[in-house]
Regions:
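Conserved hydrolase catalytic core segment
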Residues: 102-141
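Catalytic active-site module of serine/aspartate enzymes centered on a nucleophile-bearing elbow/loop
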Residues: 284-314
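Conserved alpha/beta-hydrolase "acid-adjacent" motif
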Residues: 267-273
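A catalytic-pocket lid/entrance helix-loop region that shapes and gates access to the active site
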Residues: 125-178
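Conserved HGGG/HGGXW glycine-rich cap/lid loop of the alpha/beta-hydrolase fold
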Residues: 18-76
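N-terminal cap/lid segment of alpha/beta-hydrolase-fold proteins
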Residues: 2-24, 230
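Conserved acidic catalytic loop of the alpha/beta-hydrolase fold
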Residues: 86-104
Length: 314
């Protein structure tokens, strides 16, 4: 297993009041005068974890983590009000200004890559470079593959558990059926749907099964925010004007350095999307990890991400 940088604690942390009722948790670790990097977590609704600080050389990087609206330590928990891609882009810009950072490196995987691309295309002059993993651009075909008809061919056993909470008559549109339950008035049904939705992703994220992640994703507090916020974004197509908005917007960031790390056997965000992004952005560096799935903490993915962040140290 490649070695992450040693565990470290934040030297600064706090809450940033954004649009009511939301308050965003943020923290800094590493070198206070170093190269700023912001870790953009997945989901949406996944939140941050202390282990995420460890992809960066703490002697070189000023490491910023934050929990997006409604998840992690941000409040209110699992809140969908005023929770869109463009609200999160605005939150990142407010946080950058709050911390007095001129330009920063964006580091994001899965939904984190979506938000990184959206932010960079909106504020290209505020970005030094991008490190992206498990590319997700929220096109309809990507959602259809994972949540309706595609990944089910590789994980029929896990998929059977995922669809079990939805009556057969509603299975023609599973995202919408889940959304109705996750936003309904029955807290028992909400939680049952949240756990099934979240465990489906946990069971498909690794090349080899990872029981600790399955357990963590099934925990009530995590699952409720993760599933509610994801379904909210997905029924709204990510709040993008067009299906291919992020790929179409690459011209605005083509001049920026970018490393794309992609697991060859990523079932959650298949390599086709990373390939499409790289084709649109020939100056990007695509690193395909031959023995990995989707998760950031698989050995080959860790190695490639560390090489990318070490490569940008100068």
């Amino acid at each position: 297993m490649p070695e992450l940088y040693p565990p470290l604690e934040p030297h600064a942390q706090g809450y940033l009041a954004v649009d009511a009722p939301h308050r965003i948790y943020w923290e800094e670790s590493g070198n206070p005068r170093g190269l700023p990097v912001v870790f953009i977590h997945g989901g949406p609704g996944g939140g941050t974890h202390p282990r995420m600080r460890r992809f960066f050389d703490p002697a070189v990087y000023r490491i910023v983590l934050f929990d997006q609206r409604g998840c992690g330590r941000s409040t209110p928990h699992a809140c969908l009000e005023g929770n869109t891609t463009w609200d999160l882009v605005a939150d990142m810009e407010r946080l950058r200004e709050h911390l007095g950072i001129a330009r920063w490196v964006l580091f994001g995987g899965s939904w984190g890559s979506t938000l990184a691309l959206a932010y960079a295309q909106t504020h290209p002059t505020r970005v030094k470079a991008l490190v992206l993993r498990g590319i997700f651009t929220l096109r309809q075909r990507e959602l259809q593959w994972f949540y309706q008809d595609g990944a089910s061919f590789l994980f029929p056993d896990a998929f059977e558990e995922y669809v079990a909470v939805i009556p057969p008559a509603e299975r023609g549109d599973l995202i919408s059926a889940y959304y109705r339950r996750l936003t309904g008035d029955d807290p028992v049904e909400q939680l049952r749907a949240a756990r099934a939705w979240s465990i489906w992703e946990a069971k498909t994220s690794h090349l080899l099964p990872e029981e600790t992640q399955i357990t963590a994703f099934g925990e009530d507090t995590f699952a409720l925010a993760f599933a509610r916020i994801e379904a909210h974004y997905f029924v709204n197509r990510g709040f993008f004007a067009t299906d291919d908005a992020l790929l179409a917007g690459v011209d605005r960031i083509r001049h920026l350095p970018c490393v794309i790390v992609q697991g060859r056997y990523d079932v959650v965000c298949p390599m086709e999307t990373a390939w499409a992004l790289h084709r649109r952005w020939p100056g990007s560096k695509l690193v395909v990890v031959p023995d990995a799935g989707h998760a950031a903490f698989e050995p080959g993915i860790i190695k490639a991400l560390l090489e990318a962040t070490d490569g940008f140290r100068s």
